[in-house]
Structure formats: structure tokens, C-alpha cells
Amino acid sequence: ADTKEVLEAREAYFKSLGKSMKAMTGVAKSFDAEAAKAEAAALEKILATDVAPLFPAGTSSTDLPGQTEAKAAIWTNMADFGAKGKAMNDAGAEVIAAANAGDATAFGAALQKLGGTCKACHDDYREED
């Protein structure tokens, strides 16, 4: 894949994740078990994506100014970046489990935890808009 395709795929992945978070936040406000299960299934598909190919060397905001918000720190701290990604996937698994159990309280708590993992990564590895 060329650089443009990689950047488009990376952006599409994170946009789909953001859209999923927004939808689940809506579901959590007035918990609907069936809607939660449907959103959890969508989240599960998103989180099954192998994101490693979306972060090839040479695709940071330093390399491609104005084309991406991915900081160069990702590539100099790949182990930490990977750990943050794993934390997101683990929190996502908690959201999915709570949704499938129909547990509104656990769903809300897991969703907050998932949002926290997004913020933790953005704080270190995403350029400010």
C-alpha cells in the first residue's frame, strides 16, 4: 500500500472507533441491552483489526506535516504505544462482555475505562487539532 492509502486506512480505523464510542455513549445514557449488544458486536469487529500495518515507519506528522496527527514519538516508543493499544483492546473486551451480559452499570464503567485508554494514547501520541 502506498503512503496515502495507509494514512486513509489509519484515519478510517480511528474514525470508526470514535463513531463506535459515540454510539455506545448514547446507549449507556439510557441503557438498552439489545442496542448495547449490537454496538458491542460492531466494536468487536473494529478491535479485531491488526493496526500494526497502519503505522509503517515514515508516516508520522514529522515525516508528513499536515497529513497526519500521528506523532513521531510512536516510532521511538513503540513498546509503550503497543501497550496502550493493548490496554484499549482489554478495555474494549470489558465493554463487550458487559454489553453481552446486559449489565448497564458495568457497561458504563467499562466504557469510561475505554475512553480513558483513548485519552492516554492521544495525550502522548496524537498532535493537537
Curated annotation (Swiss-Prot):
Pfam family, one: Cytochrom_C_2
The protein, known as: Cytochrome c'
Outcome following mutation: S30A: In strain: M110 and St Louis
Post-translational modification: Binds 1 heme c group covalently per subunit.
Molecular function via GO: electron transfer activity; heme binding; iron ion binding
Gene Ontology biological process terms in this record: electron transport chain
InterPro entries attached to this UniProt entry: Cyt_c/b562, Cyt_c_II, Cyt_c_prime, Cyt_c_prime_subgr
Origin superkingdom: Bacteria
GO cellular-component term (any): periplasmic space
Residues that coordinate or bind heme c: R10, K15, T68, E69, C118, C121, H122
Effect of N89H: In strain: M110 and St Louis
Classification of source organism: Bacteria, Pseudomonadati, Pseudomonadota, Alphaproteobacteria, Rhodobacterales
Function text: Cytochrome c' is the most widely occurring bacterial c-type cytochrome. Cytochromes c' are high-spin proteins and the heme has no sixth ligand. Their exact function is not known.
Effect after changing K19G: In strain: M110 and St Louis
Record's keyword terms, sorted: Electron transport, Heme, Iron, Metal-binding, Transport
